[in-house]
């Protein structure tokens, strides 16, 4: 069917279809054409008796959109046909069906390009009173702000003074996306992930209706506003949550768990069960699987109420900490976006004997985060427990499955439940006095001395959490298999170590209790039963709110452009040091008339928006009109960036690009000065420094690193001795390693839990500064801090003690001690000296294992990850078998004699 076009019309694109007039379908051809510099849509109908031609000018009032699928949030079956709507200045809205979807989408893409080209040529037009656009414009305008959930009223603005950005979308009939969960409200930069079942958006759809750079932002903004108006479409429905915690002291289950898990007449909807000290064996630190995990998981499943059917939602374990989530089968369909995370707070975060595990999920439309933690032990270590809590909060973040969204931290959830062996004790040294008050049931007097209550009151830990009234006796410490208090020589003071806390609204605790019937461990299990109000979406009301938002956004997007104001654009970070955080803050304000989306974007040819030592928090988000947001610029030099800063290859200099969608870019200048550190400096360079690194000129540091690299290469090739050609003989080992090891040898051989207890952060920074600026007679800080400083030093080395070139040979020779020693003999001299020096020191430490509580397996596992690291290109491909060979390689020298 060859259409006849008006004289002078140049066809650009064409598609055949049907015009829908109620139940009738009439064949037609839609043609995009250009005539006399004006783009037009020509509609030609082919009925039985007539040939009708309509011409619709493509101007600022023209709309041509796809029905239903224009939501951008649903997918379309391949080549299934599509429907479009067309409306112009003088025409009613007309509906067409195009059987060939590919041709339709291509045609719509051409129309969109024509609209954009035409908008560049248009001058303000005199609006005709008969135009549908004019009729819309002269209606009483609602306050956009109220409809979108914002406080500002835009109705008084002079719209003619605003630049128009043509928006070809019309969204009043869109299908709404799944309701956003409220993480978006709590952290505006998070684009909440949708249900796994939800189809994805096609690239073709995105190109048709929104410029590529704006598609995701529009979707995100719609979700953001939906969240703000959440109260309009959700009902609060109560569900029963059972939360339990038990430190099982490495024991296996020896009785039914029903007295703990099935103690309420009505079965709960959700179970959250946490264990600590699940497995105390040395192997638990090094292997992913544990027999105890299987035993206790099965015991929990058998202990759940038989009145209801449950399904395991998630299990997560880190060494001895395990968290299980179960839900009634009829509720599982309402749980989505499940994610797990673990955080070790043992030394350097490598030893997971202490720390936390967590599960986050969305139940209906409420976000939950369940945390199970085991904090530092001993009465006097309450500050370390506080630090463990802060570390878990700071380091534990979740990535929502199958979505590229910013990570969500613990506190960005509607409801957080924190359970576990928190290990806070009573500030009462007299066990007999405590037991006397317990026998008199005067628990309220004891609770005044409870460390957790004291720390919460002082806002040093768990400040924003609630805890129910404790009316049960302390749950620690008992003789195993009995109800008797600890009768060992240590005679531990009873304490409420095992706790359950929560934060969030609509949370009502019904019971908080211990379960004395279970005697497996030296702790008693604890449980709490909650009624939690969960946001359940009313689909009809939700659809109405969604359509309302989209309709108003379509009008607003043509009327306003976004704008930001920054409080400052230049930043200088003075005296930046290794592992010492510096922060600078500034404010951004939305001084425009519409909500806006901002983000830091990579510069040309860069993959990240900033250098590795810099971070902006938040790095993206939404701002409402007149809203102000604080942004923190954080500079932190870690082991990953310290070497290139030490060598002068990089400087504290960067430029950040703050991008405003549909607006302009803002440029932030970052500057500063860095103080070099011995941490992250090569062993060769350190052996050539007789003075502290801060006293060495920067130019000399660069020369030392370059010379050291060349000589190390020669040494590996065994061409020349390491010190040949130098005027000054280098040190046998770096003075920094000698100072740390010598201190530990003199003062820490009898230190309990050496290399297993983290150091204090303030002391670690003092040690780093001390080694960088002086050659001290004594190292500041306690033994644990000095021990961790040694580990940090080894981890930060740009080339590990056993060079990357010999990594694979070490693994291959792990079965043969003779070959292992040959490989070590091929190391460059200073690397070989450091390795032998450390092995001699560790063998000496192992002689005092009865006092310091260390063993060869633990030491081999910890130090093999530092001394025998895989090359960067193999890091992600390291297998458990590789790690086992590395441990075996080190055991050859730990179990050998002093001559080794």
Curated annotation (Swiss-Prot):
Residues 187-199 have a biased composition (Basic and acidic residues). Residues 1-119 form the PH domain. The keyword Hydrolase applies. GO terms for cellular component: centriolar satellite; ciliary basal body; clathrin-coated pit; clathrin-coated vesicle; cytosol; early endosome; early endosome membrane; Golgi apparatus. SUPFAM superfamilies: DNase I-like, GTPase activation domain, GAP. Its main location: membrane. A motif (Clathrin box 1) lies at residues 73-77. Residues 160-201 are annotated as: Disordered. One of its GO terms (biological process) is cilium assembly. Keywords: Cell projection, Cilium, Cilium biogenesis/degradation, Coated pit, Cytoplasmic vesicle, Endosome, Golgi apparatus, Hydrolase, Lipid metabolism, Membrane. The ASH (ASPM-SPD2-Hydin) and RhoGAP (Rho GTPase activating) domains form a single folding module. The ASH domain has an immunoglobulin-like fold, the Rho-GAP domain lacks the catalytic arginine and is catalytically inactive. The ASH-RhoGAP module regulates the majority of the protein-protein interactions currently described. The ASH domain mediates association with membrane-targeting Rab GTPases. The Rho-GAP domain interacts with the endocytic adapter APPL1, which is then displaced by PHETA1 and PHETA2 as endosomes mature. This is Inositol polyphosphate 5-phosphatase OCRL. It comes from Mus musculus. The gene is Ocrl.
